[in-house]
Amino acid sequence: MKKHDLINEFIKNHQEVVQYIDGLNESEFGYAQIGKWTAGQQLEHILLTIKPFPKILNAKTFIREKFGNINRPTWSYRTVLENYTKTSLKAPAQFVPQRELSIDRKAGIIAEIDSTLKAISEVFENYTEDELDTLTLPHPLLGQLTIREMFYLMSYHPLHHQKQIMIGL
C-alpha cells in the first residue's frame, strides 16, 4: 500500500469507529460484558494508542538513532495481522483506559482523536516510501515494526475494537 493510501486508510478507519461510537446512546456507551471494556473505554483506548504518534513521527533523527532500520523484508498487511493475532492481544498498562468513563467525556475524547489524526496525517507526509519501509518503531506486542507495518496494524486496530463493541452490544 502506497503512503497516500496508507494514511487515508488509517484516518478513515479511525473516523469510522469514532462515528460509530458517537452514535451510541448512554446505555450502549457504558455497557460492557463481564471482563470486557465499554464502548467508552474502547474509545479512550484508541486515543491512548494514537496519541504518541505525532511527537515520535516528528523526530525522524531520533527514530533512526534509537530504533534503527529493519533487517528483514517489510511484512505485508496480511502478515502483520497474522502475527498480531498470534500475540496476547492484551493492551500494555499505558494503553489501558480508565475503569469508569462517563458519556460526558465522549465529545472531548472524540475531539482529541480528531486533532491527533490531523497531526499524524501532517507529520506522515514528511516520510518517503523508503523511510516507511526501513525506519522502525517498537510495538509492545510485536517488537520492531517498520513505520509502514505499524500503520498497517494501526489501520486495523480501530476496526478490531469496533467489532468487539458490536459483538458485545
Predicted regions and their residues:
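Amphipathic, well-ordered alpha-helical segments in soluble domains
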Residues: 13-20, 49, 116, 157, ...
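A short small-residue
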Residues: 27, 93-101, 137-141
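Short, helix-capping/interhelical loops that line the mouth of catalytic, cofactor-
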Residues: 1-5, 55-112
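Active-site oxyanion/phosphate-handling segment shared across diverse enzymes
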Residues: 113-131
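N-terminal leader/capping segments at the start of a protein or of a new domain
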Residues: 21-25
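Hydrophobic packing residues in well-ordered alpha-helices of helical domains and bundles
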Residues: 10, 39, 109-113, 151-154
